[in-house]
């Protein structure tokens, strides 16, 4: 079943918690019926219009029945017949339309119409940089981003610190800059009343927005001459930074002139908002020169800031715009309060801790990567409609975006974007019949072309408990349960742990076989056997053990969990560990202290960290230079291949993870020690129980507790 599940994911981008659906029983009351969908995964492209059902607007797909005599098709969603259009008439069983072929359960249609405007990139640049070196980092990053923006894209630029400066990009001399106060929130109405800034798209384009190829030299000169905020920072005070006001100004400038169009705001920042609407922290340090973390639940700032940024996110979502937060800093910038700006719009969140230059520049660059066709890999202004057959009910979505106007809307989506769709069977679902789901997503490509992606899948309802259990996808369930359980904000870590334990106990009682009072008799079916292990590692992950995280770090990790495809999100729950033996063996090993052997190299992948660890013997051999000797070529090979594997993971991933090479008894070894199960092997000192004790406690609770 596992191979079949992965083949389906590769073709359709879907993972289901249950791949066989119960017609009766309580299986889905313990684990909901959910679909984890890679909404922007690549698919076969058809240069034609979709064929819609006249009754329910579903799209023709391989599951539909074709009446070749009448040249009509039966919709599996509403069960009504629709006549085939003229261009599709004459098809036969041996001459089918591409969308009817079994392998084309997911296809993308390139529509004949285009968007009026190309993609708009509006740069919102924080000039309250940390110091001269970090100001250079900002300028270098801006140059990389400008280089990768498409030539025909429209570009705008605003910089802010204490005040906001909106720059004109036209060819007129002298070129004007409009200065705005950072004290207030801006709306489209306010800008119109000011007279000079915003009246219509005809005034904005050519003035505040220009094609990149028409103003490229001007933009580069602006970046090269970009100066830090001229207002001095007093001792024991933070820079006066009006992030909220600047973002509201940018949105207000474009929301009425570019509704339902591809607009991307890129927010470059190096610190928290300390002034004006959206302030997340007081301007004065509690202690002179001290960089403290934000107080996530500070009543003076947290509530108003979240409300303000949520309002901005709703405005962007309603017109199909999105915002990326590109932060490089050593302090919290307020992501814990601003998360809706990306979460509700489909934007990307980059957090380069300690001003890590490689992570910051490479992550910002990857946002603008291109496909083999030359278009940006991200899609814009996406609207997804969910269709279900009459025996299923669509319940909603967990993940990026927002329900708006009868669809699920996201201003942008990346190849890695994953959302969770919830369904429930209706009472009239019957054994032996199929339930059908169709996901229809329209979006704009960076070349102005409009596309419609259609994914259709079907699963059988059954009364057989064994068949339902056989179709259980424990990896997808682990990711979904983590997302579902973390929707709630817990006051204490113990509260979250108790909720995880409670759900795991209920699950085990429902599906395990055991003899009352006999812990050793408990056994889960093979398809579920690894699920308790995932929950054990979930309890130990940085998603739950947030005590040593800053509020921004906790928000960042949870954002990754909600946004990444199953295989990557699973690494946040339980990392992968690859072992390279000095005799040439390469294999995946358990994330366990017993795997830390002295004669191996380990590659740990936690998604946000990639670590190459060299065992004690290997590290000693390297120090003594054995890998440079011809007779020890094998040692040189595993050193090279392990590092290449790690760097490949970093190069392919967005955001770019932190990377380090360490060895036995070095400081960075603590990263590996944090994640491995402390089973007793190796020299790991910890207060955490190991999996064996956790599993034994679970067994005892289940077999001795009759509740």
From Swiss-Prot:
Molecular function terms, GO-annotated: GTPase activator activity; zinc ion binding
Similarity section = Belongs to the SEC23/SEC24 family. SEC23 subfamily.
UniProt-annotated location(s) = Cytoplasm; Cytoplasmic vesicle, COPII-coated vesicle membrane; Endoplasmic reticulum membrane; Golgi apparatus membrane
Tell me the keywords, alphabetical order.
Cytoplasm, Cytoplasmic vesicle, Endoplasmic reticulum, ER-Golgi transport, Golgi apparatus, Membrane, Metal-binding, Protein transport, Transport, Zinc
Gene3D superfamilies in UniProt: beta-sandwich domain of Sec23/24, Sec23/Sec24 helical domain, Severin, von Willebrand factor, type A domain, Zn-finger domain of Sec23/24
Q: Which residues form a coiled coil?
A: none
Kindly provide the name given to this protein in its UniProt entry.
Protein transport protein SEC23
- Record-listed Zn(2+) binding positions: 53, 56, 75, 78
Q: Name one GO cellular component term.
A: endoplasmic reticulum exit site
| Cross-referenced InterPro entries | ADF-H/Gelsolin-like_dom_sf, Gelsolin-like_dom, Gelsolin-like_dom_sf, Sec23, Sec23/24_helical_dom, Sec23/24_helical_dom_sf, Sec23/24_trunk_dom, Sec23_24_beta_S
State the membrane topology: Peripheral membrane protein
Q: Which domain of life is it from?
A: Eukaryota
Recall the taxonomic lineage recorded for the source organism: Eukaryota, Fungi, Fungi incertae sedis, Microsporidia, Unikaryonidae
Q: How does it assemble?
A: Component of the COPII coat.
């Amino acid at each position: 079943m596992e191979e079949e599940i992965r083949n389906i994911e590769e073709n359709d981008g879907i993972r289901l918690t249950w791949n066989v659906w119960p017609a009766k029983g309580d299986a889905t009351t313990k684990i909901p019926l959910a679909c984890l969908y890679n909404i922007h995964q690549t698919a076969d492209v058809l240069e034609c219009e979709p064929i819609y059902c006249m009754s329910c607007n579903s799209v023709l797909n391989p599951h539909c029945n074709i009446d070749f005599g009448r040249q009509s098709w039966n919709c599996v969603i509403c069960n009504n017949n629709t006549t085939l259009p003229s261009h599709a008439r004459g098809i036969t069983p041996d001459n089918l339309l591409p969308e009817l072929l079994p392998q084309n359960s997911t296809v993308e249609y390139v529509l004949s119409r285009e968007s009026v405007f190309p993609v708009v990139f509006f740069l919102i640049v924080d000039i309250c940089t940390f110091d001269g070196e970090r100001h250079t980092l900002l300028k270098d990053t801006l140059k990389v981003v400008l280089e990768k923006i498409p030539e025909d894209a429209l570009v705008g630029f605003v910089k802010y610190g204490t005040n906001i400066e909106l720059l004109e990009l036209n060819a007129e001399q002298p070129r004007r800059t409009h200065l705005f106060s950072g004290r207030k929130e801006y709306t489209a109405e306010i800008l119109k009343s000011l007279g000079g800034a915003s009246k219509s798209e005809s005034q904005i384009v050519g003035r505040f927005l220009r094609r990149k190829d028409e103003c490229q030299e001007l933009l580069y000169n602006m970046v090269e001459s970009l100066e830090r905020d001229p207002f001095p920072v007093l001792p024991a005070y933070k820079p006066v930074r009006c992030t909220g006001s600047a973002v509201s100004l940018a949105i207000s400038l474009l929301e009425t002139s570019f509704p339902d169009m591809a607009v991307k705001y890129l927010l470059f920042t190096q610190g928290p908002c300390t002034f004006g609407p959206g302030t997340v922290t007081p301007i004065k340090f509690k202690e002179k020169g001290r960089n403290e973390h934000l107080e996530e639940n500070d009543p003076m700032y947290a509530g108003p800031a979240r409300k303000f940024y949520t309002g901005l996110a709703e405005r962007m979502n309603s017109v199909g715009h999105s915002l990326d937060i590109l932060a490089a800093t050593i302090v919290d910038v307020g992501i814990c309060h601003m998360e809706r700006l990306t979460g509700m719009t489909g934007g990307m969140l980059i957090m380069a801790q300690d001003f890590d230059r490689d992570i910051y520049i490479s992550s910002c660059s990857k946002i603008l990567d291109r496909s083999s066709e030359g278009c940006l890999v991200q899609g814009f202004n996406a609207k997804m409609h969910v269709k279900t057959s009459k025996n299923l009910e669509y319940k909603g979505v967990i993940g990026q975006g927002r329900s708006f106007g009868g669809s699920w809307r996201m201003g942008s989506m990346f190849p890695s974007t994953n959302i969770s769709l919830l369904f429930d069977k209706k009472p009239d679902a019957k054994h032996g019949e199929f339930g059908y789901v169709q996901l229809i997503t329209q979006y704009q490509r960076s070349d102005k072309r409009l596309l419609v992606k259609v994914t259709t899948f079907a699963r059988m309802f059954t009364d057989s408990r064994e068949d339902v259990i056989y179709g259980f996808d424990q990896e997808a369930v682990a990711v979904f349960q983590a997302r579902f359980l973390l929707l709630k904000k817990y006051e204490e870590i113990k509260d979250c742990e108790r909720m995880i334990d409670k759900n795991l106990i209920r699950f085990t009682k429902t599906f395990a076989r055991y003899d009352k009072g006999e812990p050793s008799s408990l056994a889960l079916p093979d398809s579920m056997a690894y699920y308790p292990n995932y929950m054990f590692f979930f309890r130990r992950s940085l998603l739950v053990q947030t005590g040593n995280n800053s509020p921004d770090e906790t928000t960042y990790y949870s954002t990754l969990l909600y946004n990444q495809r199953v295989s990557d999100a699973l690494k946040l729950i339980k990392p992968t560990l690859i072992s390279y033996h000095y005799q040439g063996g390469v294999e995946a090993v358990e994330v366990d202290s017993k795997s830390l052997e002295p004669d191996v190299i380990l590659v740990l992948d936690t998604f946000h960290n990639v670590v190459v660890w060299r065992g004690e013997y290997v590290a000693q051999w390297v120090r003594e230079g054995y890998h440079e000797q011809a007779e020890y070529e094998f040692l040189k090979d595993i050193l090279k291949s392990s590092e290449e594997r790690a760097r490949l993971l970093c190069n392919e991933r967005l955001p770019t993870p932190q990377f380090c090479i360490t060895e036995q008894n070095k400081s960075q070894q603590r990263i590996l020690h944090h994640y491995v199960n402390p089973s007793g092997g190796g020299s790991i000192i910890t207060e955490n129980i190991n999996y064996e004790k956790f599993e034994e406690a679970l067994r005892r609770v289940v077999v001795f507790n009759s509740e």
